[in-house]
């Protein structure tokens, strides 16, 4: 909708359903259409915790999906739409505009430093001490070669995180 940056307060107001027109946040006179995720979504839980400061997201059941590809398609094809996906879905030309939060762009660098507020760690667990094969797999997953490939795909790697908590 032509809006390049929102304050966190504006983002919260949009996703909780209080702000419903882009003109109220510096955009055109156009209805805001939320493209949301179901309550069971881990991405939604992360977004609510870190982007919405724990506020409950206003669901739009007609545009609700747990499929990031479908979500992007819905945002691209719907006037006034806004949604959220993992940064990895925005590599290359995803056909959508990103929105900064408090003038901080959603980039890997800003995630690594903790400047961009919406991120979380993924975890791997073993039952007890890992056996030799499992240890080799974990070493590979946490290694530089694999990390470089993951970054090319738009995923961050824990070894580059300087921020340790929100």
Regions found by a protein language model. Name each.
Residues 1-166:
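Exported/periplasmic ABC-transporter solute-binding proteins
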């Amino acid at each position: 909708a032509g809006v390049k940056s929102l304050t966190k307060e504006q983002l919260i107001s949009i996703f909780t359903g209080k702000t419903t027109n882009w003109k109220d946040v510096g955009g055109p006179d156009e209805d805001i259409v939320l493209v949301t995720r179901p309550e069971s979504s881990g991405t939604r839980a992360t977004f609510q915790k870190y982007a919405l400061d724990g506020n409950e997201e206003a669901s739009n059941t007609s545009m609700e999906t747990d499929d990031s590809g479908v979500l992007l398609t819905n945002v691209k094809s719907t006037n006034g739409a806004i949604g959220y996906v993992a940064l990895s879905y925005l590599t290359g030309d995803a056909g959508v505009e990103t929105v900064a939060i408090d003038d901080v762009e959603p980039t890997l660098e800003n995630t690594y430093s903790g400047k961009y507020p919406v991120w979380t760690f993924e975890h791997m667990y073993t039952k007890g001490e890992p056996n030799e094969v499992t240890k080799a797999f974990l070493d590979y997953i946490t290694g530089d070669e694999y990390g470089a490939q993951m970054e090319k795909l738009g995923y961050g790697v824990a070894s580059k995180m300087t921020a340790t908590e929100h």
